[in-house]
């Protein structure tokens, strides 16, 4: 499976012949200015919550590529009013799509749209097919609910966790989250985009190493194969 970091919490993930894009925040992000939006071509756009740093390019990417948006009920309604195709989930619900199964799971955070309106409650996604399973946590604090993931989903091969602190859990708590979700391989996100979430990357890697976990930190635009 090929995973490309699009900056902040944004990832492009290829599942067999389907392209999934999570939380696209590319055009407003100066750090991602080398990524051309027209080269990001999702079949599905998955949005963890309504904050601007997660949905900035959702409308354009969905429309330009005739992609299906997957998020909570409120986010899908809000985008639907703008003409975006969508499928709503709510917490604890899962659904089979062409790429595999998506389950919308709990996050401890807030959510509203850039225009200030209610965006429902924030979440994360667990995604799996017959070969691989991963978790994109969205924006969240460390929460005991994460212990439900290994009880209710296939074994995680990797997880994308926020590590930047201030608005989400920091890397110390994220390393504990890696234990809760029983996942050895973590890709960090939601760090170094803005001043309040600037962190020491070596210390972050150390925090995971101390718990026997691997923290992978990608450069914006870079890909890995898992
Ligand atoms: Ni947020
Ligand atoms: Mn955020």
Where are these regions (language model features)?
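Active-site environment of divalent metal-dependent phosphoester hydrolases
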Residues: 28-29, 51-56, 76-79, 93-96, ...
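Active-site-proximal loop/helix segments of hydrolase catalytic cores
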Residues: 114-123, 128-179
């Amino acid at each position: 499976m090929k995973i490309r970091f699009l900056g902040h919490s944004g990832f492009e993930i290829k599942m067999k012949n389907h392209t999934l894009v999570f939380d696209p925040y590319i055009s407003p992000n100066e750090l991602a200015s080398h990524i051309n939006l027209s080269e990001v071509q999702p079949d599905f756009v998955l949005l963890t919550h309504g904050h601007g740093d997660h949905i900035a390019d959702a409308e354009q990417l969905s429309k330009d590529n005739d992609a299906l948006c997957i998020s909570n009920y409120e986010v899908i309604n809000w985008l639907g009013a703008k003409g975006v195709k969508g499928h709503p989930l709510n917490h604890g619900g899962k659904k089979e799509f062409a790429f595999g199964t998506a389950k919308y799971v709990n996050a401890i955070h807030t959510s509203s749209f850039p225009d200030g309106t209610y965006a429902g409650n924030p979440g994360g996604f667990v995604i799996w097919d017959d070969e691989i399973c991963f978790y994109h946590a969205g924006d969240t604090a460390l929460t005991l609910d994460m212990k439900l993931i290994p009880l209710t989903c296939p074994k995680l091969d990797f997880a994308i966790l926020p590590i930047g602190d201030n608005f989400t859990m920091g890397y110390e708590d994220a390393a504990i989250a890696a234990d809760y979700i029983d996942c050895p391989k973590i890709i960090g996100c939601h760090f170094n985009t803005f001043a309040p979430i600037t962190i020491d990357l070596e210390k972050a890697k150390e925090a995971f190493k101390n718990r026997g976990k691997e923290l992978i930190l990608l450069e914006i635009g870079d890909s890995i194969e898992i």
